[in-house]
């Protein structure tokens, strides 16, 4: 949008609608990841060529497909792929296929240096204690694991135990991310989960005893949630001394139970904005510092954790004393999402693995890469993706953007920045573009405005392509827009 008034009109049209954040997928949404015939060997060779131009390290995500069954399905709100867990035989079988996928990629990652490891889901704490060493050994079958690397595992309260947490630490895992969502025992029932506040506190107590840093996810904007309930839960979790709290708005979309049957019980966007404001104030009063629109951490924690996976995901191109350095992300396993960025001048690919477990298994049984579809970045798309991600850190370094792309990020999007400056959501200096105030709550709206022109081009191109496809041709499977916080770790519904 080149006109400031057009941006203001866009904001007024959309500011009362529910938001869907872009923490994981950035730009563009997987709705536009339409390439199905991806020559993965060439993609991997292209990554190797990029590695010769910019030193590349790997953020590794290892997924687990399974979640406990709930009524309503998928905790009532989760938009992300998962399979229903029924027995440990599923996990044993899955680990065998995970190992097969690693075998296919091993030569391509020969000599690659890991930057961080994240075990996500599904629900990655469904495994038995003796399976966590095997998980780490599967990773070691492909990569050398550096000493002192950050290794995170996410899970849900009711499937943690002291023995399991101890096994996680002994196998090399250094951080736990717990998807609590609601502490209130009555509110959590809306999701069908069989968890209790006591399980949350016992898990955090075990983490402290063992010496394992932990983070907690809480959601606001829940059906029938009051401001007083939200404050009580935040204060109770903060009182445990947990080092990191992610507090994010419930995403409601698609065919989920919350979207179809509970919309009348949900707070309005204006109510959610007030919850965001109050939640931020409560957490800051409890000694937490805001580091993203959704994340709050204690800077002087007794059990420090760098949250490196998240930081590198926001800033995949950096520099150190040896020059430029890049951070690709490999999503290993069922429904894994990968970003092989290439270079700013020669962008690479984003792609996702199969989202049906039978298809994932079939591909690997046939010695085929289990990739479902993907997207090849243009230079303009890569700029938008990196801009979206850097904005998650609440500001953009203008000089670094200029060095990387040869463009000034303010001049590139003048009308958008001017409109959001008018609203008090953005400030601009010679060095930085900073998002502040209510702009942090409305960051998805800011990102939508920044990407509007390019997305319109893509929609028109897609429509023209669709017109040339016979009516009987299968349509691409829909992949949900990003829920209200990143889903490399928030996928444990």
Each predicted region: which residue ranges?
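Flexible, acidic/Gly-rich N-terminal and inter-domain linker regions that tether
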Residues: 1-61, 69, 461, 468-470, ...
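Canonical Radical SAM [4Fe-4S] cluster-binding loop centered on the CxxxCxxC motif
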Residues: 54-96
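Hydrophobic residues in beta-strands and at strand termini
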Residues: 64, 155, 435-436
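A short local structural element in Rossmann-fold oxidoreductases
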Residues: 72, 76, 188-189, 402, ...
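C-terminal scaffold of the Radical SAM
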Residues: 84-106, 115-118, 122-407
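Charged, E/D/K/R/S-rich low-complexity terminal regions of large eukaryotic assembly subunits
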Residues: 336-493
């Amino acid at each position: 949008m080149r006109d400031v008034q057009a941006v203001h009109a866009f904001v007024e049209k959309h500011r009362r609608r529910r938001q869907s954040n872009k923490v994981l997928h950035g730009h563009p949404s997987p709705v536009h990841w339409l390439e199905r015939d991806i020559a993965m060997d060439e993609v991997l060779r292209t990554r190797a060529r990029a590695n010769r131009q910019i030193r590349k390290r790997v953020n590794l995500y290892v997924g687990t497909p399974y979640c406990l069954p709930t009524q309503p399905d998928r905790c009532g709100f989760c938009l992300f792929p998962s399979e229903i867990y029924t027995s440990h035989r599923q996990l044993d079988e899955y680990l065998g296929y995970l190992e097969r996928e690693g075998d296919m990629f091993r030569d391509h990652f020969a000599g690659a240096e890991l930057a961080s490891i994240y075990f996500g889901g599904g629900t990655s704490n469904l495994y038995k204690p003796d399976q966590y060493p095997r998980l780490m050994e599967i990773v070691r079958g492909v990569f050398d694991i550096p000493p002192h690397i950050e290794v995170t595992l996410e899970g849900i309260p009711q499937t943690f135990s002291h023995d399991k947490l101890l096994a996680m630490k002994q196998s090399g895992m250094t951080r736990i991310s717990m998807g609590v969502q609601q502490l209130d025992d009555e509110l959590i029932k809306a999701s069908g989960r069989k968890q209790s506040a006591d399980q949350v506190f016992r898990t955090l107590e075990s983490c402290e005893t063992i010496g394992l840093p932990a983070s907690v996810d809480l959601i606001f904007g829940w059906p029938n949630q009051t401001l007083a309930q939200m404050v009580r839960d935040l204060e109770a979790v903060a009182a445990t001394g947990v080092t990191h709290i992610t507090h994010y708005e419930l995403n409601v979309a698609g065919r989920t139970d919350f979207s179809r049957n509970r919309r009348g019980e949900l707070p309005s966007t204006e109510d959610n904005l007030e919850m965001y404001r109050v939640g931020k104030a409560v957490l800051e009063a409890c000694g937490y510092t805001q580091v993203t629109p959704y994340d709050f951490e204690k800077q002087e924690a007794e059990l420090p954790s760098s949250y490196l996976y998240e930081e590198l995901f926001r800033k995949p191109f950096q520099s150190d004393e040896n020059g430029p350095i890049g951070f690709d992300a490999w999503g290993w396993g069922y429904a894994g999402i990968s970003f092989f960025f290439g270079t700013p001048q020669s962008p690479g690919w984003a792609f996702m693995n199969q989202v049906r477990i039978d298809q994932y298994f079939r591909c690997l049984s046939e010695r085929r890469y289990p990739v479902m579809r993907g997207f090849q970045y243009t230079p303009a798309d890569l700029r938008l993706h990196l801009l979206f991600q850097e904005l998650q850190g609440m500001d953009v370094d203008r000089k670094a953007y200029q060095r990387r792309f040869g463009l000034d990020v303010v001049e590139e999007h003048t009308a958008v920045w001017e409109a959001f400056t008018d609203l008090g959501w953005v400030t601009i200096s010679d060095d930085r573009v900073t998002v502040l105030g209510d702009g942090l709550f409305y960051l998805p709206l800011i990102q939508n405005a920044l990407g509007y022109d390019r997305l319109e081009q893509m929609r028109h191109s897609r429509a023209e392509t669709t017109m040339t496809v016979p009516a009987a041709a299968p349509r691409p499977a829909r992949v949900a827009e990003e829920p209200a916080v990143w889903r490399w770790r928030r996928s444990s519904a």
